[in-house]
Amino acid sequence: MQDKLIARAKELLAEGKVQKVVGWKKGLFDDDITPAVFTSAAELDKDFVFNKFCKANLSKYLVGITRQIEIAKSTTRMNNTMAKQRDPNAKDAPIPQEVVLVFLKPNDTYSFTQLLKENRITRGDVYAIGVPCQDTLDGGEVCETCKNKKPVSCDELIGVEAEPAPVQSTRMAEVEKLEAMTADERDAFWKNEFSRCLRCNACRDICPACTCERCVFDNNKLYTSQKVAETSFEESLFHIIRAWHVAGRCTDCGECSRVCPQHIPLYLLNRKFIKDINEIYGDYQAGSDMETKPAMLTFNAEGDPETTIVWERSKEREAE
């Protein structure tokens, strides 16, 4: 499979259809695989790998790459306009056209599609190829609770079926175990987990749903960027707020838990939100297609039993 991917990437580069390739690169050890950008056939032959250790979801890297592509286009257009103002006969500089090739496993394509829906990635700047997951070695958190092996929003598929057999997912089983606990038991569980947090921000930085250019947790004026938490409340604050911020947009890719150096099961927080959203608003899988409206960004006056709740509660506060 690795040879097929390299051959296809080299072919697209040679044809000029893509100018960059986002894939995986081997490090010092066989299991030390990291995302990488390739720009030539020689680089692909030397460093590109695809095996069971290629765990990283590559979709988020497209946010920064396509942003730079669009900035280059906008800068050229602006320069052309300014040149015309100085000299009406000035010739326009050609608008740079750059396309990046990315290899996405079925699970990763959901993150890619969700980013497209949120306009965080420009579709014309990306050529997406769906590749098989090969039951990636990830410690079990992702592949053992796979939600679907069907790739979405890809331009091409290599070694993966467009309509694979449905997956019998058991990913909500752990959430149900937490729900069966008493409030005190859940409180003790999460306090124990969050007490190990280093605030390294790895979960935020890897999360495809966390794409804000300026994060609230990097604000020194609000004292939200500190690394040391004085109380258990502060330890939980970061993770709970982040879970709220990605609610309805999290595709359950599992990257947050995969990169956590303390092995905190952060995916359980996100799955609890997903489970509640499905029960309250109906089945919804973020990133499953481009058409379905996000559950948390949709308002239906006919189906909302409390359409006047804001007005009524504001009146209650005024009366107090």
Predicted regions and their residues:
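Ferredoxin-type iron-sulfur electron-transfer modules in oxidoreductases and energy-metabolism complexes
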Residues: 171-195, 212-320
